Design a protein with these regions (language model features):
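Peripheral/terminal regions associated with large enzymatic or DNA-binding modules
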Residues: 1-19, 23-226
């Protein structure tokens, strides 16, 4: 697996930016990478930082729009594969888990389509790793990478579903990063906002509520009261 091999280069380095050949980057991607790494370097809940920003729930086929809360980033239990950043600690936390030869089964709380991905998909296992360990990726509200969806290994036909607007501010932007503990903008592996975030925003719901606005969750896997 190419990404596993790339991640293992962190044996020699402290931090890593992974860009596949079909990614197009913002001129400021490195500035964001440096500043976000500096800010989240010691946050134990963060499993990686994304340069991409999803507008499409890829494993279900619906539009996704995170809440705009005045910050430049939010958190999601979805691994990024269209431009991602890892520290040595983040990568080898995953790798130690991966080396136990985990299996993905029908009862795992990850999107159903993800479960059908090939066994050599690193992303499939990173999904499960994040859910099992309650970890999150940091995502920018405005992307620093995009993908043109040209025909190739992953796209048998040209597609535009991964094309997004990319950031193009003046250099030296001061980013407004939220602390994980204080953020009310966190999403689960099904691109659904966490109930505690809605409660903090004033919505009167039980903390043990299963949020399934897009209808992608196999509800028999969830034992929530609501």
């Amino acid at each position: 697996n190419h990404i596993i091999s790339c991640g293992d280069l962190l044996n020699k380095f402290e931090r890593q930016i992974v860009l596949e050949e079909d990614c197009f980057v913002s001129p400021n991607y490195y500035d964001f990478a440096f500043k976000s790494l500096t800010f989240y370097n010691t946050e134990k809940k963060v499993a990686g930082i994304s340069l991409y920003s999803y507008l499409y729930y890829e494993s279900f086929g619906t539009v996704f729009t995170p809440l705009i809360d005045g910050y430049d980033t939010y958190f999601m239990q979805v691994p990024s594969s269209l431009g991602q950043i890892w520290t040595k600690e983040q990568w080898f936390g995953f790798k130690a888990w991966y080396n136990t030869n985990p299996e993905i089964g029908e009862n795992d709380k990850i999107p159903e389509k993800v479960k059908t991905w090939p066994e050599n998909s690193w992303k499939k296992y990173f999904y499960k790793y994040m859910v099992e360990n309650d970890l999150f990726f940091v995502y920018p509200h405005i992307a620093f990478t995009t993908n043109f969806g040209d025909t190739g290994t992953h796209f048998p036909e040209k597609t535009q579903i991964y094309q997004v607007n990319i950031e193009y501010y003046e250099k030296g932007k001061s980013y407004n990063f939220p602390q994980f503990a204080n953020s009310n903008n966190k999403y689960d592996s099904y691109f659904e906002i966490l109930p505690q975030c809605l409660i903090k925003r004033g919505l009167k719901i039980d903390p043990d509520t299963c949020i399934d606005i897009m209808g992608s969750k196999p509800l028999h896997l969830f034992t929530n009261i609501y």
